[in-house]
Amino acid sequence: MNFAIFAIKFCIVYEKRQSCEAASARMIYLNDRIGDLDVESALPLLSEQRRQEALRYRRDLGRRTCVAAYLLLRQGLQQEYGIEEMPVFSYGEHGKPALVGYPHIHFNLSHCREAVACVLSDCPVGIDVESVGRYNEQVARYTMSDREMELILQAERPEVVFTRLWTMKEAVLKLSGEGLRDNLKDVLTGRYALGSEGEGPVSVPLITTVEAPDGRYVYSVVYGSGGGK
């Protein structure tokens, strides 16, 4: 069975840039039609490890995004590295996954109700995709710095700015393998400081942030040698 039926490349970004000590090849796979996925037909395409993980989700959306993200990774490994047999996952101290037997291949997965995303790179990488919706100001004030809150409150579409900032923070933390932590206000500092250059104040030179053309979701991706500031 051809798994590409279930994991179509809807958006591809490819670039080579001097980011580690050598040029780094990067590929982003994004599927924003996860509602079209036939989960039951796709389950046999998963490794036993991932299938059991998917089946632990009781809700359809969780199971669907788990399956879709895995299929994107599988497709990317086949097309970019010629890997036909899916490697086993190992997990770091904070739960960041890695591919057993392929230390030179770095990847990261993310999903929301609108889309799933997978990024592959020769360097450590972090990606986060989030749906754009009404934001909770109380949550924003707890997770955003004073400057970030100012940008949100001044924006014509504050929910989009909040989502951009949130995905940036998550991508940086996923790059380092930390995951979410108590203090999120100081994530975008140092080398990830906002607006030091680039397209505007809600941008970071080392982080690529993209809003879907239809405005349903935003994703951010960051590459580095280890995620330190």
What do these predicted ranges mean?
Residues 5-229:
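Core catalytic alpha/beta fold that binds nucleotide/phospho-ligands
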